[in-house]
Amino acid sequence: MLSISANEFKENLSALSLLDIRTPRERADFDLGGIHIPLDDLLTRIHELNISTKYTVICYNGTQSQIACRLLTAKGIQAQNVTGGLEAYLSLP
């Protein structure tokens, strides 16, 4: 599975195709933009994603986004996980 560090994510955020898989409540606390499909809905809404796009997937701590990346990859969609998730991103200086 591909991954990107929180620092690389911060430096390249505007150029990435972000897929935020956090719950609506979690996202309301801190919205990074991008596409929002909660992990629980990912399989039923996967058709909303472009198969030719590489997505950078984020959750709160990087655990659920690993699961999402595996699901996306199994469906032929390129995905990379943000290591440590939003928690790691927010801890950066």
Residue ranges and their predicted role:
Residues I58:
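Short, surface-exposed ligand- or partner-binding patches at beta-edge/loop junctions that are enriched
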